[in-house]
Structures are given as C-alpha cells and as structure tokens.
Amino acid sequence: VYRQKLTIEDEKEFFQGLVQEISMVKNGRIPLEHYYSANCPDDTFRAIYQAYVKRCKTSKLLDFDDILLYTYELLTNRNDILRGWQKRFSYILVDEFQDINQLQYDVVKLLAKPEDNLFIVGDDDQSIYAFRGAKPEIMLHFPEDYPDAKTELLACNYRSASTIVELSQKVISENSRRYKKELFADRMGGNPVTIQAFEDGKQEELYVKNQVKELLKKGIPYEEMAVLYRTNSGARFLVETLMQYQIPFCMRDTLPNLYEHWIAQDVISYIRIAMGERSRREFLRIMNRPNRYFSRDALDDAQVSFEGLRWFYEEKDWMCDRIDKLEEDLNTLKRMTPYGAINYIRYGIGYEEYLKEYAGYRKIKAEELFEVMEELALSAKGFKSFSDWFVHIEEYTQQLKEQAKKQASEKKGITISTLHSIKGLEFDAVFLMDVNEGSLPYHKAVTESSIEEERRLFYVGITRARKFLWILYAKNRHDKELEVSRFLTESGLVLKEEKDKKK
C-alpha cells in the first residue's frame, strides 16, 4: 500500500474495504483484470492484490479464503483424495445455509457426491452478508441442483409476539427473490408496534431515553433492551445521551468517537494553529487541505513560522499570497465560536472542496464526509469558547475509554448494535433507529438485489424483538429534510401521503 504512495486518511475503513475486496476476488474466482475496486483506482487495487498474494506465498501463509480455494483445487485435481473424503462422510448437514458463498457451496457439492445426502437448513430472509460473498440465490436454486430434494418450510415464529411477526411479514413479502411463505406466530397477541416520526435526531434519541425508563418501570432490565442502527456511526449521539443520563449500555461494535475521526482531527488542528500552536505536526495536517501547494521542505524546524514560510517562497509571489491568505483565515478563526469556526473552515477556507476531491479519489460519496463535518458542528453548537469545547472532547473521550473497560469485564446494560452484528440474538424490547431513505436502505444500495438485502436486514432487526418494538425515523437531520424509508411506505406501515408531505 505504501509503495503505491496513496494518501489515505480513513485508513481503518480503507483496509477493511481492501480485505473484503481481496476476499471477494478469491471466493468468486474473479479474474483480476475483470474486477473493479470500490476503494481505490483499479490499477492500484490490482497492484496491492498481487503484492498481497506474493507476500503470502513467500511467507508460506494462507488466509481463510486460501484454505477454501486450495481445498477446492485439491479436490478437483486429485480424484483419489476426493474419493477418500467422500467415503468418510455418508451424510452432510449445513446450517445457516443462507450465508454460504459459491466457493463453499462447490466444496460441499464435491464432498456430497455420489450419494448427494445433503441436509441444508437456513432462512433465505436472513441472508445479509453479500459483502462477504454470500449469495441467497444459492439456497433458492438448490432444488434445481438437486431435483429430488424435499423442501420443508418452517413458517412458525416461536420468538416474537404476533403483532411483530405480522409486521415482519408485511415487510419481507415485498422481496421477490425468496421462498414464498406466510409467517405466523406461536405467541398470539402482544403489544402494538410503535412507528414514530421525530422532527430531528436529537428528539429521537431523547425519546429512546424516556422509553428506556418506562420499560424499567415495567420490570424489563437493561439487558433485555436493544437499540439497532444500520451503521455503527449512527450511534454516536445516542452514546453521548446515554452517558449524560448515566444509563448503562454495551456496544457490540467499536465505540464510536467522533473526535478521533480524521476530519475532526483536521478541524481541531486548524483551531489549535489559530490559537497559537505552531508545531510542525499540526501544520502538516492542514497545510494542503485545501491544496495550497506548500512543500514539506518549507517546514525544516519543529516549529513553523509564517515569516519562515515567506522567506522560503520569497521568489514566488503567488505562494506568498497563499501564505497571507492562510494567516488571515487563522486570525479570523480565533475570534469565532467553535460552531462558527467549523463552518468557516468548511466553507470560508475551502475544506469542503478538499473533501470533494478526496471522496472522488477514494470512490466514496462526498456526502458521507460532509456528514462528519455536520455532526462535528452540531457537537460544538452549545460551546462559547474553544477551551470549553476541548474540555468536553477530553471528558467524552475519557468516558468512552471507561465504557470500553466496563464492557470488557461486565457486558451489562442496553445493547447498542448494528443490524449486521445483532443477528442470532433476541430481546424483550427493540428500538430500530433512523429508518430513513439513505440509512435503511443504505445510500450505497442502488441495485434491485442490494435493495432486497437491505430489506432483509430490516427484517432481521424487526425479528430480534420478543414483546416490544419501536421503529423510529427523523424528518430532519443537520438542517436537511429526510425521507421516511420506502420499507415503511411500500408495506403500508406509513401512509404514502405522509411520505409525500416531507418532500
């Protein structure tokens, strides 16, 4: 990666994406020249992939995908070994079959021959791991591969109240690529499902806090409550709210700290420099965001001075103009509130243009980066001075560290999780958050198959609840109008007229 001289700020997301893409290429046995990366330029991805494969071979290492791939190649190239393993297993049972990928399925088919004594169990409505290569159509086409197969549909839900099961049926029946089945509940009756709209995200989070208190009065412990989001970043402000009201919680995913995001670090560096900080490290973060064409060679001391920069570029008037403009902007910044400063950095200094360029380079939507700026501005809105805001950041970061220690030892409190991480679990009370277009379905889901997967994800969230279920969405966020999720309107859970009013 570093030999490619990439400028990557969101390293964690970038490397996670790379690992997933390398896995997709191997599992799908996709010719490298026919794979188009969603993370970086295609030539760059191919170079990284080839270097990764070469390093694994020279180091005599196998990753999980290699184990599958080499197993398949061994079984297809060595009939003697294949026959030995076929004789060893008279019957094969595969659980969670909806999550199988093509390579795994091909291995299973080889092992099952010649008797084909296969017993598969799965729920096609819970296939939610396409990003790992899972293909629900494998399960759907199983009777075509094995025409003598018998199919048993298990449509009874023993977990959830009938009110919840009926709603889940309305949602998932909109998917066309599934086994048709009428879901019904073993437990009849139950509490009505609450579908609630809020003016903004803050009201949504405060509502959850109040409902949690009501549930406690009804004798439902924190451990029987779950708050579910489409993405981990969605929980940022709820976490802050719960800590503020001292409500215990446990994150199944990484605790989100907005202030550790690279965009937040850039903004903080701008403000620190405006307040008089002159370290080379801080200056390097922001000097070319947006691009001012400053060279690292101009920063030859541990401390940066504007006079030193002017001396370095004394024969380039246009560069001196850029230095003057930056100094002028920093002088303007230091007289602002944190909220005003963040917006000035974004619009006045031109940081938004840098984010647009970076988004294009990384093949991501610029709106994802703008959202971080908007959340950062919102977090700073109540503070009158930079010092007060920095104290809040420090205290919040410390609280998160303490929360992480608690989680490692206790695992107590309300469960906060993404929909992907909650599969297989169940709770008395579940809150499904931010059921808006762009969040659920996620804005990256544009094809029919990806929309169906998002609907399955929503279905998984709904069916985590035993007794109580809340489906919540906001009308506005960061001064932008939001649209209720199509999953609520198409199934008649929210009237279309109500959706149209929001447009």
Feature-to-residue mapping (PLM):
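Conserved helicase NTPase motor core
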Residues: 38-141, 156-160, 424
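Helicase P-loop NTPase motor core
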Residues: 147-150, 155-248, 274-276, 333-335
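Proline-centered turn/helix-capping motifs that create local helix->coil transitions or kinks
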Residues: 10, 26-30, 115-116, 171-181, ...
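Short glycine-/polar-rich loops that comprise or flank the Walker A/P-loop
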Residues: 114-117, 123-125, 146-151, 189-193, ...
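Conserved P-loop NTPase-based nucleic-acid remodeling module centered on helicase motor cores
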Residues: 1-20, 33
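Short alpha-helix plus adjacent loop in nuclease-associated cores
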Residues: 126-130, 159, 252-275
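Conserved helicase C-terminal RecA-like lobe
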Residues: 38, 221, 236-241, 268-498
